[in-house]
Every structure is written in structure tokens, then in C-alpha cells.
Amino acid sequence: MKVIEHLNSSENTLFSFEILPPLKGKSIQSIFDGIDPLMEFKPKFINVTYHREEYIYKERDNGLLEKIAIRKRPGTVGICAAIMNKYEVDAVPHLICGGFSKEETENALIDLQFLGIDNVLALRGDSIKTESAFRPHKDGHAYAVDLINQISEMNGGNYIVDDVQLEPTNFCIGAAGYPEKHFESMNMSTDLHYLKMKVDAGAEYIVTQMFFDNQKYFEFVDACREIGINVPIIPGLKPIKNLSHITFLPKFFKIDFPDALSKELLKCKDNKAIEQVGIEWGIQQSKELKAKNVPCIHYYTMSNSTSVKAIAKEVF
């Protein structure tokens, strides 16, 4: 079932979450161990992230260094198939621009179609850690809107090779939205312009980056509606779990903590106290969002479901 069908057919706020593929060498059981505690809340879909290659330098026998590309968290498509088989819940793989040619993207989408996976979250993706800015594949897409256009074209039966009659795909496309704007955008108006381009290209729903101030989400939704973005906008929440999150989350994701949350976090002396504040704040956020009848609340678990379970018990 498509994500948009889940959203349109429910009168109540839905529950969904995102997981990471395990580090290479770990078993699929580590994924199931993270999902099992959350199944009692009846998630309608589960997102699985995709991670770009990284580069390391390995010394060769002659003493020279060789640059090698590695993927630390492979398995996105296989995990999606395993989730759908084991839990009978729809899985949403992330599909990114970085590192893929258009043909590789087309082939990946064909694989997904053959597996019965008909939802994708289309993202540009981050730059490689060793690069200061995002660099697309020379034969790939530079922006998420271009990736969405390609998926939409395939939904219309238009493939890269267009001299034969080809079967249309049937993907439901999700896109990312940023209540505090994407850090590369000049301002919020520009960011919303690009978001509308993604919706016009075929995105049927939006999932937001994490935020900790619900007012910013509400203002973001209002701003979207004012410029004609009328698709469902799913709020994304991330429970704060440890002391490092106090500095890491604002720095990496370019987001702010509201004053009330900051004051509580600064009182904490250890990770246990931080996690409890994160749970309490997550419950408060979730209850307010649910009271406003948002279509779904999407939780970023980072494959650690403890805090999300504690929040969901009080909300769903």
C-alpha cells in the first residue's frame, strides 16, 4: 500500500519511524530487535535510510596509499524486503542522488518494483565526508527535484531508453521538507520555492527534518499552504538521548533548541537524565501535534527504539 493511501484513508494521526541499516557485518536480527518493540503501535510504514560511500586510504605493498570506496551501512533494499516479509508493513527506502548515475537509479527502481516496494523517499543526500560540498555523479542528478522527475517519468512509462514500449512503474514519492530551512538555502522563501518544485514534479507527501519547536512546524505548514503546496506534511521528531546531542544535533542539522528545552538539558549531568528530558519533550511535542490532527508522526530512531517506545506509549 502506498504511503499516500495510508495518509488519505486514516482519520487519526498515524505512527511511523525510520531506521538505519546496521554496520557491515551485523546480522538482520539487529534490525528486527529495533523494530519489534515498536510493532505494538501499529506503524503504517517504516523508512530505511541509504548511506553514501566513504573513502579510506589503504597502504599497498609498495608503500603507496590507495584510495578505496567503502559502504559502512549497505543493505537498504534487502532490509526493506525483509521488513515487508516479516512484519507485513510497508517499507520506504531512501533513494539519493549522490553516487548514482541516472541509469543506476533506473535499475535500482526496477529492482524495487520487482520486490513489490512501491514507496520511495527521494533525497539529494549529503556530501561525502571528505568533500566540502555535494558533488553529483557526472551522469547523475544534482538535485532531489531531478530525481523526482526521473521517478515520475518512469511512472509514466518513460525510461532512459525510449525506443521501446516499457511498463510504467507505480511509485509513491516522498520528499523532505525543512521547517528551519535547508542549510544551503539563502532564505526560507527560496527553500519553499524548491520544495514546491519537488511537489510539482511528483512528490505526493513531505516528511520534515527533525525539529524541537512545534511552532516552527505549524508556521512551515502555513507557509507551504500559502504558496500552493497542499500535500500531507508529516512532522519528523528525534528524541534527544545523550549529552553529545546537545551540541551535535544543532551543529549537524542546523536546527535550534527552544529556550525551555535548552534550560532543561543544561541541568542534566549524565546521559540518563538527558534521555529522560528527551522522552518528556518528545511526549509533549507529540501530544500537541496529535491534538492538531497531523497526518502522521514520524520518529527518527537511529535504530535505538527505547525512547521512541516510551513516547509512543503515552501518545498512541
Give the label of every model feature segment.
Residues 125, 138-170, 175-184, 222, ...:
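Active-site pocket-lining/capping segments in soluble small-molecule metabolic enzymes
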Residues 102-149:
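Flexible, glycine-rich active-site loops centered on histidine and acidic residues
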Residues 1-48:
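Conserved N-terminal beta1-alpha1 strand-loop-helix module at the mouth
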Residues 14-32, 90-103, 172-190, 266-280:
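Active-site mouth loops of central-metabolism enzymes
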Residues 41-74, 125-139, 203-220, 302-304:
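Glycine-rich, proline-tolerant flexible connector loops at the mouths of alpha/beta enzymes
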Residues 18, 46, 112, 198, ...:
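Conserved, mostly hydrophobic/aromatic
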Residues 101-114, 190-194, 219-222, 242-248, ...:
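Catalytic cores of alpha/beta
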